[in-house]
Structures are given as structure tokens and as C-alpha cells.
Amino acid sequence: MAAKYLSAANAAALDKDLMSMGAFSLDQLMELAGLSVSQVVYKVHPPSKGRRILVACGPGNNGGDGLVAARHLWHYGYKPTIYYPKPGKNELYQRLSTQLRNLSIPFTDDFPSAIKDSDHIVDAIFGFSFTGSIRSPFDTIISTLEATSLPITSIDAPSSWDITNGPPSSGPGANLMPQYLISLTAPKPLVRYFKGRHFLGGRFVTPEIHQKYNLQLPEYEGVDQIVEVPIEESEEKL
């Protein structure tokens, strides 16, 4: 089945509805999102391809998804390292960080050196709600992501991309094209500009929300929390 994509306004509204109509807490949604991300990494980069996963986290919910994904990856047998230069102030992010430290998962301040010791990168810096200019240190980090030959999995949006117009015309992120992208809940318009493998995660949307937004999403198989959705099947706007 073809997957429609959500406009910027509907994507933000749907997130609110998940917590009001759907009665989900932020903790639950972040846990489910991070679990989906970890399953994508396992699918496209199994441990046999290298266990060293560098997770670059921003200060918001996208970064929180990355922290959750790192915990699951550790339990799968990977060796994650966290780059988290500006930790979010929400108590939830602090607990997620503590959970990782309890597993002796290292945090690094040296992103360029960490890349040299990694096999795969999870881009959890900025999500679909990103707007404005990119501030330090993330401008340099995104430029480093553009230059690396390592495979990258981006969460909901390649960092710096606009939800509707895709990559910026210039500056950091203009040439960022990750190999893998996982859209959370439903694809966003930016997937039209994406050229890699595209996955969907969000096996928790209630029938009521499905109906409200007229979502047309592919079925998940078995116990999978993700499903691969070719870009050409994500074209009709909601």
C-alpha cells in the first residue's frame, strides 16, 4: 500500500494527538521511536558489518530517540558511542543518559575522532521540526557527516533538512544524503528529495488517529516495528 506523507502542520498536530487522543506519554513515544530506529540499524547494518555505532544526538526529542536507540543497540550486541554536546534539560533526557552510563556506554566530546573509530552513524541531531540557522557545534558536525564515507541512518529527517523543501540550498547539510532514513509515524514531504533506503516506524497509531488524518500506511509484518517503504510510494500529500 502507498504511504501518504504528512504536511508540516499535520505532522505537528498528529504528535499532539498521540498524547491527547492516543493517551501516550512522551516517554512511551520516544521508547517506541528509538526501538524502531534500532531495528533499522540492525536490518541495514547487522553486527557482522561492524559493531561500532556512533550516535550523534541533538538537544531535543530527536536526540532522545537516538539515546533510546543506543540502549537497544547495546542489548543487540553493538558497541555504541554517544556524541551529545548539548544535553536537553528535560528530566527525561537525563534519565535516558543515566541508563546509558549504567551500561558503561561511552560519551565523547570529540566527534571527528569518534568517526574514525566507527562503522555506522545514527543521525539524531535535528528532526522534522527543525527551522532556522544551524548553530555551533552542529554546523561543523553536519559538515563532517556530509564528508564521511560511513553509512548514516537519519531519524525522521536528515539533520538540517526542511520538512517540505528538503536539503538547504547552501551551507551545512546542502550535500547531506544519508544512506538510510526512518520516518516516524508517517513520511514527511522531504522524502521526495531522499535517494536512499526509506523505512517507516510507528506501529502504535490508533484507529481514531488513522481516520482523522486519513493515513494510508503499509502493514507491518510479524513483530517488526519497521517496514521499508520505497520513496515512489510516499508521494500523496496529507
From Swiss-Prot:
Pfam families from the entry? YjeF_N (PF03853)
Q: Which residues bind (6S)-NADPHX?
A: N61, N62, G63, G64, D65, G127, F128, S129, F130, T131, G132, S133, D156
Q: Name one GO cellular component term.
A: mitochondrion
Its cofactor is:
K(+)
What Gene3D superfamilies does the record point to? YjeF N-terminal domain
- Using the record, list the residue span of the signal peptide; answer none if the entry has no such feature: none
Q: Is Ribonucleoprotein among the key words of this record?
A: no
Q: Which UniProt keywords apply?
A: Cytoplasm, Isomerase, Metal-binding, Mitochondrion, NAD, NADP, Nucleotide-binding, Potassium
- Give residue ranges for domain YjeF N-terminal: 11-217
Q: What is its main location?
A: cytoplasm
Recorded hits in InterPro entries, A to Z, give: YjeF_N_dom, YjeF_N_dom_sf, YJEFN_prot_NAXE-like
Q: Write the Enzyme Commission number(s) for this entry.
A: 5.1.99.6
Which parts of the sequence bind K(+)? N62, D123, S159
Q: Which reaction does it catalyse?
A: (6R)-NADHX = (6S)-NADHX; (6R)-NADPHX = (6S)-NADPHX
Q: Where in the cell is it found?
A: Cytoplasm; Mitochondrion
| Cofactor binding summary note | Binds 1 potassium ion per subunit.
- PROSITE patterns according to UniProt: YJEF_N (PS51385)
A GO molecular function annotation here is:
metal ion binding
Q: Which enzyme class, named as a word?
A: isomerase
Q: What does this protein do?
A: Catalyzes the epimerization of the S- and R-forms of NAD(P)HX, a damaged form of NAD(P)H that is a result of enzymatic or heat-dependent hydration. This is a prerequisite for the S-specific NAD(P)H-hydrate dehydratase to allow the repair of both epimers of NAD(P)HX.
Q: Which family does it belong to?
A: Belongs to the NnrE/AIBP family.
Q: What is this protein called?
A: NAD(P)H-hydrate epimerase
